[in-house]
Amino acid sequence: MSYTPMSDLGQQGLFDITRTLLQQPDLASLSEALSQLVKRSALADSAGIVLWQAQSQRAQYYATRENGRPVEYEDETVLAHGPVRRILSRPDALHCNFHEFTETWPQLAASGLYPEFGHYCLLPLAAEGRIFGGCEFIRQEDRPWSEKEYDRLHTFTQIVGVVAEQIQNRVNNNVDYDLLCRERDNFRILVAITNAVLSRLDIDELVSEVAKEIHHYFNIDAISIVLRSHRKNKLNIYSTHYLDEHHPAHEQSEVDEAGTLTERVFKSKEMLLINLNERDPLAPYERMLFDTWGNQIQTLCLLPLMSGKTMLGVLKLAQCEEKVFTTANLKLLRQIAERVAIAVDNALAYQEIHRLKERLVDENLALTEQLNNVDSEFGEIIGRSEAMYNVLKQVEMVAQSDSTVLILGETGTGKELIARAIHNLSGRSGRRMVKMNCAAMPAGLLESDLFGHERGAFTGASAQRIGRFELADKSSLFLDEVGDMPLELQPKLLRVLQEQEFERLGSNKLIQTDVRLIAATNRDLKKMVADREFRNDLYYRLNVFPIQLPPLRERPEDIPLLVKAFTFKIARRMGRNIDSIPAETLRTLSSMEWPGNVRELENVVERAVLLTRGNVLQLSLPDITAVTPDTSPVATESDKEGEDEYQLIIRVLKETNGVVAGPKGAAQRLGLKRTTLLSRMKRLGIDKDALA
């Protein structure tokens, strides 16, 4: 069948039709105008436009029913396999009645898009030799169109083809323009957020900046960054809630990872978008969203923060309003999450570098302090006495464990040396032992030294400082004079021992540490507990494995060895050549009480080395006495002039029938400790059993 484009509409009629159709802004309006024109000209009762999208293989349908109701529909199944598919393969006019239509396209007839009609006609829409759809006309009566009417329908179709193509081009141009504008705006947002977050190297500041930018651009009210904690199976949550536009609430907490939505994202490494309901099985900290926002929260979006193949954490966004997480917004939020991941990676790296730098500085200071003090400490354990042998057996027994050790003994007995021996024999010997003296230090300064502080934590805290517990991570911490620790600081020490965690002064961040504690004191902690000067729970926690160091007076057989070792060490340090010590000097030193113990002995030897001329050690006897007046048994018991120590002890033992201890024993009468008397009896060769 041939068509006459101009038909007999007349120039004016054709112009009016063309002008009317060209004025339509979109395809739905074009379909409605076409229906009115064909209805007014009695050519059809309704008209529609079917467009074919070759790229997506979908069909779009625009029509107006006889009752004036507009219809818009698209799919890639029923409609796409209807009459438009036929017109694409055979570009001739397609016409049929409803019965034929139903037999040919039963699914389309049953879809409700086409109410029962009399006759149907579909003409191809073409532009530049390309068919891109069809223009359909429907009559309610079963009466085919005459040849003259087909001419007019074809004329309408030609005009509709031109107009539809223009509308499509305009729509596509608008879509492209909108896309360009959106991409430009998205790029600006990305640049703004990237510049804002990449300059933040502190995690708290970074989270605050991320929340501010996301809230500003997306109006999202609840923003969190979730990172894995140093503690196993724990999460650190940094949250910001915009309950008040001008005063957002910032929170930080640590929660269990098990059973959380974040755990699902860590496993899948994929975005998770869910509609929230208060009845959903949520983890306790996720249910807190409802405590904060009531039932306003609608949607939760969790975006993985990836650095290469490593997942650093999760960006978690909760929104009260619907339709915030659109496809376009989610695409942009994914890109933002990539930038945030870079910033988080940088901040964590900076945090680690800063921590290692501070640790290195503190280690250098501590090492310098240790080197400065090394000359005043004996460099190795010296002693062959049974008392020292028992101590060393205990050291060897406990060293390989991580148990807390409490070293007890008088001042100057070598408690730090024993602590160092325990550390060197332990599995932690690869790292330097950290030490801290608790005596004569104010509580605030001691707390800062032990646990560290943040910048601005107190007046004068101009920089962050790492404490001894943090410095001793994976190593041993020696707390000397622990009995002098202020009572108000003891609970914090107890918490570290029990939980292996603490906070720096001025911070609420929990720091995990793996420290083996070795404590020492010259005080009677049991008595201090009874006098409420020391916490009983801390005492029990420290007293896991006590080691009692004997005073020097109870191991006189070790004194000659110590004198020789100190003499040669000090002489070498002073550039002297002393290779001989008189036996009388050794006997004199061995007979002394040494209330200052090994430290006092070392000081006496150092003075002797200074005064020595030649290579034989010269001890100034008038400056020291073999038995000090306040500890001499003669002061309390001797009433016979000229009675020496040996004779006095023999006499008192005979009078007490060989009883040493107790209120009526020899030690009590002589004014000595039981252990001191036994030590002297051993030195003088006195057997109490032979005297009884």
Swiss-Prot record:
Q: CDD domains, per this entry?
A: AAA
Domain Sigma-54 factor interaction positions: 381-610
Where does this protein hold ATP?
A: 409-416, 472-481
Where does this protein bind DNA? 663-682
GO biological process terms, semicolon-separated: phosphorelay signal transduction system; positive regulation of DNA-templated transcription
Gene Ontology molecular-function annotations: ATP binding; ATP hydrolysis activity; cis-regulatory region sequence-specific DNA binding; DNA-binding transcription activator activity
Q: Which domain of life is it from?
A: Bacteria
Question: Start and end of every GAF domain?
Answer: 202-344
Name of this chain's protein: Formate hydrogenlyase transcriptional activator
The species is Salmonella typhimurium (strain LT2 / SGSC1412 / ATCC 700720)
Gene this chain is encoded by: fhlA
